[in-house]
Amino acid sequence: MRKDSLIEDYFEVIDNEHKAYWLGFLMADGCILDMPLSNGTKIPRTVQIMVSLCDIEIIHNFMHDIELDKNIRYDSRVSIHGEKLEYCKVTAGSSKMCNDLIRHGCTQRKSKILKFPVTVPDNLIRHFIRGYFDGDGSVWYCERLQERKDRKNPSIQRNFRSAFQGTSDFLEGVKSNLEANGMTIGNVRKGHGDVSCIEFGARDTMIKFYHYLYDDSTIFLKRKYNKFIETFNYLNMAY
């Protein structure tokens, strides 16, 4: 396999905002691919990121930071509802980068065993969490009519909420850090299979979460950032 030209020791030490962000994103939505050897064993060889085409900025930003110069690959499939889903992906071939990521806890087949990292400095944890949120977190707003027996007319229930998915061990680390910064976070709940989740939505917590993620930040997924701003404005919330 041809070796790619890139900053191979980029993840050797997590010592700035962007490195912490990318470690978080890769833990959520990246993968490490093994290369089989002639003796039947395998070694970690390639880092891969694949995202929806609408989030291609992630690919461009990652390639820029690790100084990777290669073509982005595009693919598509049809969902069970008949909708065409378009993707883009990039791979970075470097055993050194793979092994550094594994040392920080970003392992192969991490969906069942992922733990909150101990190698990210305290002052960079929020950037790490933002990266993970951009990869495997969500923010949404919805409205529905709610009927109550003690009221003549139904009221509108407004839900502005956010959530993370992952292993229960990892999410306990996220929950602990968010609560240490004044947010009210729900308990880690078991989801489908090995996936757990945490969810929260008190208005003061959503405002604190927004500032925790984005204050003085230079890298983030614009789509999720814009969802916060659009919802704050729609609800006339001061933030």
Tell where the protein language model's regions lie, with residue ranges.
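Internal intein/HINT superfamily modules and their associated LAGLIDADG
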Residues: 1-239
